[in-house]
Each structure stands twice: as C-alpha cells, then as structure tokens.
Amino acid sequence: MATETTNNNVSPKNPAPTVPSSIPTPSISDEKITEMVERVKTDRNVRLSLADGIKDIVNRNLIIVGTGDGGCNIAQEINKACPDTYFVAYNTSARGMDKLNADVIIIPQEEDGSGKVRSYSKEVFCSANGYAQELLQAISSLADKINNLEYILVTTTADGGTGGGVSPMIAPFLNENMDLPVIILGVYPSLTEDATAMFNALQWQSEVEKTGCPYIILDNNDPDVSSKLQVHQKVNAQAAQMIKILTGEMFGPTNISAIDNRDMYMLLKHIGGRICIYGQEGKPPVGKSIDEYIMDMIQYTNSPAPNEVDGIGLFIKGPETFVKNADTSLTKICATYGNAAIRYFHLEVSDDPYIAIIMTGNSEPTDRLMIMKQRYDEIMNNIKKTASSVTDIMSDMNNPLSKPEKKTAPKNMDLSALDFFKE
C-alpha cells in the first residue's frame, strides 16, 4: 500500500537575468557539464517517481467496525471486496463469530445477545467492564498499520438490539477520539418484520441524525425477492460495491479529471448528511443518456432514493471517445434529486467501462420512514383489537374450577424474578 506523496517542486523558475555584454561570461568545465547532466537525469527519475504517486490520491483506506450479527456480516462482505481494509467485529453474541475473518473480535463474555433490546446493548457497551475502551484500543492499534487511512466505517442493521443500539454511540465516540471522519452504514428492515423492528429502526434513524456523522442507508425491503437470505446477500453485495466506489478501489490514475482525497472529504464529511452511492459496469447504450443510465441504477438499488442533494461526485471510466464526449451536466439528475451546490468529476480512459455517482447532503428518507411508522401502527392496532376481542368474549365467563385453595408460600421465597414485570 503506497503512501500519498506530494511533489513540492512545482513553482516556476525565475527568468534568467540579462547578462551585460561588457561582463565576461564564465566558462563551464566538461566535468561540471557532466555533473549537471547526471543531476538532471536524477531529478527526472525523482519527478517520475512522484508522478507515480498520483494514483494514490484517488484511493483511500478505511477501518470497518461491524456491530451486531447483521453489521458483522455486512462488514465481512466489504472486507472481502476491499482487501486493504481492516475489520473489527463487535457483538453481544458469540453465535457465528468464529466464521468471521475479522482482525479483532470483541464479545462481552458474560452476555449472549441483546434480544432486540437497544437500551440493553447500550448499557453493556458503556459498562465498567471496559468494552468501549477495548474497541478504541483495537482501532488505534490497527490505525498505526494503515497507510492513507481516511475513514472509519461502522456497519449495522437498523432494527437490531446490539448494532442498532450501539452504532449511534460508537460512531461519535470514535470520531472524537480518533480524529478521523466516521461514516455509519445501516440497513432498514423489511416491512414483513415485527413492530419491534419498525420501532428500533425509527429510533436508530433519529439517533443517527443527532450524531452529525455522515451515513449510508440500504433497505432489506425487497418485494421482488421472497427469500430473506437472498435479500440479505443482495444488500450486502451492494454495500460492498458502494464502499469500493467510496475507497476508489474501482478507479485508477487519470490526467483528465480526478476526484482526489480532498474532494472526497468535502463530499463525505464537509457536506455529509445522508450519502447515496450507485455504480454499475458498462456504459449507456445508444440513445440513452448518462443521466438516464444513472436513474436506472437508482431505481434498482436497495436504498432509499436521493433527495435535496447538495454534493455530487461523478465517476466515468471507459474508452477514450466515450469519456471525452460524455455529457457531465447531469441536467435530469439535478432536476429530479436536487441541484447540487458542488460537483466533482473523475474521468478515466479504460478498457473496462464503469459509471458511478456519489450524492451527499441528502435529507432523511421521510417517505420510507413514514411507511415504517404506518406498518408499526398497523401491527399495534391489530394487537389491541385482539386483546379487546378476548376481553369481550370472556366478560361473562367464570373459572369452571371456581376458586382453588391457595398454596402457602415458602418463608424464604425469592421474588426477584417479579421485578421484570414492574417496568
């Protein structure tokens, strides 16, 4: 992994002073000329080596922190797609953790899952057992091994207890202590999940907004795929593809126009907000514009559509004729999703065409959140109706055993289990 290098020898030379004809010009020996020629050769080699380093400014590395079962599976998929990344897994359950290819695994030994209870996982993470400190130490240790480390990515499912509970805590915690931008990647639940999943996801979204950290949303709600496992695999693969675009894994050096690390920082951190990332191999067929090609990508990606976009990074890679003639005005994109205040472009000549776009500063996906709220209300109303029906049916019923004789309670009975019902 190469380290980004900057060529400081770029200032223009001052024009040579005019030498009056009356002053004799000193002669230069053959040895001096030979020395100067060799120095020029050396300087040229140095400049070429510095030029080789240009390719590194479009690539950036990150550490992934997978939280909970779903978050760790997402992180594993990203780690496979981006081999230069490091992967830390945090979970309150040991189930399946031995199958992960994580660099560091943190499991509270006295716990066995969170049972979808977000507050429980928060308490475990902040407990006196030091799991927050252990995570920070692991991240710090890995950071020392990585060149060109630019971001930390925290992955989770939004509806779970462990990842959904701790990810909005971990992100600002690492952001403050590591002095690195932290991005959260979360996945919304399918609408076929229970009311707790809807409630947890809505709580997670509200907390993520409060962190101020940039975030990416994917969605497990896919009516076209009936198998839950297939949906998860599809979404995890899309997450990996998004991060490959973000890290620059999909692109190389170019002398036309590049989105370097500073440009990406402006998009992801300075503008921030909700980040939407789309990419696809190939190029538009004859008769289809780049805008239409990208809008098709947006439609078929398991992610809420962009809205009120503030920043855009457009990546176009392909044959020279296609790249040079590409329409980068994005007129339809801006008219549909928001007229971004700032845009960056990466144009690269390559035999392997690929088009991608990063759209930042999006507001929260209100329409999708309202659908989850409606689903939650629907489930809870059905529960209330069922309870009311049972009450009505039993209103004139008596226990056929009449009133059984009570058993005498032991003198030293342990009543602590009843505390559970006091909440």
Region spans (language model):
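Tubulin/FtsZ superfamily GTPase core signature
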Residues: 2-423
